[in-house]
Amino acid sequence: MKVISNFQNKKILILGLAKSGEAAAKLLTKLGALVTVNDSKPFDQNPAAQALLEEGIKVICGSHPVELLDENFEYMVKNPGIPYDNPMVKRALAKEIPLLTEVELAYFVSEAPIIGITGSNGKTTTTTMIADVLNAGGQSALLSGNIGYPASKVVQKAIAGDTLVMELSSFQLVGVNAFRPHIAVITNLMPTHLDYHGSFEDYVAAKWMIQAQMTESDYLILNANQEISATLAKTTKATVIPFSTQKVVDGAYLNDGILYFKEQAIIAATDLGVPGSHNIENALATIAVAKLSGIADDIIAQCLSHFGGVKHRLQRVGQIKDITFYNDSKSTNILATQKALSGFDNSRLILIAGGLDRGNEFDDLVPDLLGLKQMIILGESAERMKRAANKAEVSYLEARNVAEATELAFKLAQTGDTILLSPANASWDMYPNFEVRGDEFLATFDCLRGDA
């Protein structure tokens, strides 16, 4: 970590804790800043704030009092989840207090080069794939960012010989100014988080900040399957490396079932360790990064063939009596489940789906359901999901929860079948988040395996 004097004796307000705010507070204190932390969670329910107070850091909890900004702070570090229309943020901007992001703070002190990965879908899987391949190739890749390891914490142990492989959300990128990765990946761009950004255009603008400071000596990897990429590519100074599953490009591409990089065959799509058309895209982006990083083709192929996925993201859980289980609880919308289904033989597949009812019909999913062996349907959206199953002429059973659904699926399954949890719905009707939903699937698998 570089020791910089930019923040020495500067009064800095950390607005919002969570993992990133806590890490930023500790880093800034180490750099000599006079830190105050403000978090909306009450102090007696806030272990992170309690720990910071024990370290001598000033904490104010329970609300975001606007008058706190009268203390003449010289910087504010905003938690990514706090929107810019928050009264504290609006007041800080009106007072012309510079806003820093936690990832930019990490950039300022990083001795290690940064590979940044953003996009609407596939960020976590691609970030993990890239780190795995780089490490397999003898490099030292450190996961950081939106993947659960705050960048401002990881950067403190990173040295010049390391590489920070950083997952970045639109929330983290919207406020950056100086941030400059050496390689950036945008997996895809879909209309998401519009409640935060206001419009798809503003959402794209936030994602596009990943390349704002890049030069022609840096590399920007874009999904050439999307028309928007061609438009964006004309506006960057970085060297663009495209990837595509639909056409041959001057980068990474799929052709006749083989993944290539600039005419060099790397691996067959059927040899990838994770199924699904989206994972071919993730693998192509990974191949581009790996080749730019000097990793040998055989190491790339070996690593991608053994990659088992990320927890809750089309995760291959294991087998019981030659019946394979996949946990794709992260698939909270139709598109994600469509991509998951693309990697399987429907005639041998039992799909567990359903969840929070957002009023959407599932007509777009019907073509992907055709030929399914069976569906197990659950959750508030069950009636809508049943209508889709009927249109696809797929038989189904109902379950009260994921555990019961998994048990029913296992009773119906035969040797060689696959059981896939890919709900196409959010979890909040029955579970606090998709992780808890997926964990119930994993726990049920463990019980079934123990009884087998």
UniProtKB/Swiss-Prot annotation:
Q: What GO molecular-function term can you cite, just one?
A: UDP-N-acetylmuramoylalanine-D-glutamate ligase activity
Please state the Enzyme Commission number of this protein: 6.3.2.9
Enzyme class comes to ligase
What's its catalytic activity? UDP-N-acetyl-alpha-D-muramoyl-L-alanine + D-glutamate + ATP = UDP-N-acetyl-alpha-D-muramoyl-L-alanyl-D-glutamate + ADP + phosphate + H(+)
Q: Which Gene3D superfamilies match?
A: Mur ligase, C-terminal domain, Mur-like, catalytic domain, NAD(P)-binding Rossmann-like Domain
Q: Name one GO biological process term.
A: peptidoglycan biosynthetic process
Q: Which residues bind ATP?
A: 119-125
Asked whether the keyword Cell cycle is assigned, the reply is yes
Show the GO cellular component annotation of the record. cytoplasm
Which of UniProt's keywords are assigned here?
ATP-binding, Cell cycle, Cell division, Cell shape, Cell wall biogenesis/degradation, Cytoplasm, Ligase, Nucleotide-binding, Peptidoglycan synthesis
Does GTP-binding appear among the keywords? no
**Record localization:** Cytoplasm
**SUPFAM superfamilies reported for this sequence:** MurCD N-terminal domain, MurD-like peptide ligases, catalytic domain, MurD-like peptide ligases, peptide-binding domain
Q: Which Pfam families match?
A: Mur_ligase_C, Mur_ligase_M, MurD-like_N
Pathway recorded for this protein: Cell wall biogenesis; peptidoglycan biosynthesis
Question: Which NCBIfam families is this protein grouped with?
Answer: murD
Question: Any idea what job this protein has?
Answer: Cell wall formation. Catalyzes the addition of glutamate to the nucleotide precursor UDP-N-acetylmuramoyl-L-alanine (UMA).
What the record says about family reads: Belongs to the MurCDEF family.
- Put simply, this protein is called UDP-N-acetylmuramoylalanine--D-glutamate ligase
Native organism? Streptococcus pyogenes serotype M5 (strain Manfredo)
This protein's encoding gene: murD
